């Protein structure tokens, strides 16, 4: 039975965001590194660094906590992450069927033949793949 490192990454970020933690530490694999790079590029996390402990590499990410001010006061926005394709049920799509998350306000992360990319990049390259997760 294998481990789902993508689900572990998303769950760690979700739990740290709900508990208002500043940093998240996850095991570093090729796929988690690529997903964290996309999150960094899209502005969902502030910084990331690679850390080594006893022959194991970890990614230490600093989360971005956004606060919005309204007439009713200040409230904190949350980052929502949802795993779509999982080991028991893989979800594939062509470039025409790539979903828009919240009408284009969120992102979908896809694993394609050209690497891991966002839904916008996949549409521009006209390439489909496995829908890994939604982030909004």
UniProtKB/Swiss-Prot annotation:
It comes from the Eukaryota. It is found in: Plastid, Chloroplast. Coiled coil: none annotated. InterPro entries: Ribosomal_uS8 (IPR000630), Ribosomal_uS8_CS (IPR047863), Ribosomal_uS8_sf (IPR035987). Gene3D superfamilies: 3.30.1370.30, 3.30.1490.10. GO terms for cellular component: chloroplast; ribonucleoprotein complex; ribosome. Keywords: Chloroplast, Plastid, Ribonucleoprotein, Ribosomal protein, RNA-binding, rRNA-binding. SUPFAM superfamilies: Ribosomal protein S8. GO terms for molecular function: rRNA binding; structural constituent of ribosome. One of its GO terms (biological process) is translation. Part of the 30S ribosomal subunit. One of the primary rRNA binding proteins, it binds directly to 16S rRNA central domain where it helps coordinate assembly of the platform of the 30S subunit. PANTHER family: 40S RIBOSOMAL PROTEIN S15A. Belongs to the universal ribosomal protein uS8 family. This is Small ribosomal subunit protein uS8c. It comes from Lolium perenne. The gene is rps8.
């Amino acid at each position: 039975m294998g481990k789902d490192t993508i689900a572990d990454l998303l769950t760690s970020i979700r739990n740290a965001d709900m508990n208002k933690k500043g940093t998240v530490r996850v095991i570093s694999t090729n796929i988690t590194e690529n997903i964290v790079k996309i999150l960094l590029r899209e502005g969902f996390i502030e910084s990331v660094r690679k850390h080594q402990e006893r022959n194991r590499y970890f990614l230490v990410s600093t989360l971005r906590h956004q606060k919005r001010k309204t007439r009713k006061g200040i409230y904190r926005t949350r980052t929502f992450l949802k795993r779509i394709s999982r080991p028991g049920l893989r979800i594939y799509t062509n470039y025409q069927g790539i979903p828009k998350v919240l009408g284009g306000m969120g992102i979908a992360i896809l694993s394609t033949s050209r690497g891991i990319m966002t839904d916008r990049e996949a549409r521009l390259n006209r390439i489909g793949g496995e829908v890994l997760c939604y982030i909004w």
